[in-house]
Amino acid sequence: LIVSHAHFDHIGGARRIQDEFGAVVLMTDEDWQMTNEPAIYREYPKPIRHLTATHGGTLNLGREKLTFMKTPGHTTGVLSTSFTVYDNGYPHAAVMFGGAGLNFDGVERTQMYLDSIAFLQSLEGVEVNIPNHQDSGEVFERLEKLALREKDATHPFVDPEGWTQWLDELLAAAEEKMADEQAKR
């Protein structure tokens, strides 16, 4: 079970999945440390610590390889993942940004977020955005397009320009947040 970040809505069910299915849980050290903060989990039980992801670390799943990237900001240990997806046998580079939300405080964390966006913008060849919440990345709109997809039409999730545009939107929102955070000082 790869955990993008240790907020309750992403890790709240991890212990149950561990108990019921024997799942191994992986996240960054910073976010494993967050599991010691009971307020984060509300009524959810703390997961058993298994694997720790590092920036540039990889995990092979059969012939597929996941590459991990630390992209802090949303939490100090946000884990983003790059991997290959396929459409009719054709490979496409996909990235899941593990923490796109701006629901945190402080200049330092906002700068972490800005640096993470800059890092993600530097990745070459990203064609598919796999958002970690359904309300970003136009997931439902893309699913509707997929249901109506004609034979030989481009897969609606294969959208390099959409990835770039989404990151630009996140960057603009984070820059506005930084101005607000600096004004609080």
Predicted regions and their residues:
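Short alpha-helical scaffold segments that flank and stabilize functional sites
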Residues: 16-17, 119, 177
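Solvent-exposed, non-transmembrane amphipathic alpha-helical segments
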Residues: 28, 37, 45, 140, ...
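Metallo-beta-lactamase
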Residues: 58-60, 65-165
